[in-house]
Design a protein with these regions (language model features):
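Active-site-proximal beta-alpha core segment in soluble small-molecule metabolic enzymes
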Residues: 1-93
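Active-site anion/phosphate-binding pocket segments in diverse small-molecule metabolic enzymes
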Residues: 98, 102-188
């Protein structure tokens, strides 16, 4: 995930929005202004969700800042608010399965804070989405989350194996290689 801010990327968004039920995720007003202008020029409205930071700190707004951002987004006539989305990617710092519950709690709490704040401010949320493969099973019982996007869940990989989310036979692909040189411990 990365912000859409170049002319080429924004044009892709416009083309997708013209030809599909496209929803963009936003977390800053500068990017929103660029996309809104392009949407206005194209005569379309683009749906968006606000990205909620569940703890990864790579993108998204802190849950208690979401209402303020939603209010500021009202200035953009060609962007339509449809909900919130998140990604608890910080779960990948877990080194064992027992640690995952903490990240599930972060995910649930951040989404709940954002949802409750927005609903109290009068916003209607059609979409409340979040997900990562490690947190998927632990978040299924959440009353706020409506859409799950569990990442590489259908493929699995060594990361999932390292925290006991998947077994080797559940991974969709195995790559076998021959090591041709390993002269010392500091050379890969």
């Amino acid at each position: 995930a990365y912000p859409v801010a170049s002319d080429v990327s924004i044009q892709r968004v416009i083309n997708l929005a013209k030809n599909s039920n496209f929803i963009i995720r936003l977390d800053n007003l500068d990017g929103a202004a660029l996309i809104n202008k392009a949407a206005a020029d194209a005569g379309i409205t683009i749906q968006y969700t606000i990205i909620v930071n569940a703890g990864l700190n790579r993108f998204g707004l802190k849950p208690d800042k979401v209402v303020e951002f939603a209010d500021a987004m009202k200035q953009f006539a060609n962007l339509k608010f449809v909900g919130v989305s998140s990604h608890p990617g910080h779960v990948y710092s877990a080194t064992k399965h027992d640690e995952i519950a903490k990240y599930v709690a972060d995910e649930k709490n951040s989404v709940a804070t954002a949802v409750k704040g927005l609903e109290a401010a009068g916003y209607k949320l059609d979409i409340v989405s979040t997900g990562s493969t490690p947190t998927f099973w632990g978040s299924l019982d959440d009353e706020n989350i409506k859409i799950y996007h569990p990442g590489n869940y259908v493929f699995c990989d060594y990361i999932q194996m390292s925290i006991d989310i998947a077994k080797e036979e559940e991974c969709a692909l195995a790559v076998y290689a021959t090591i041709i040189s390993h002269p010392d411990e500091e050379t890969y």
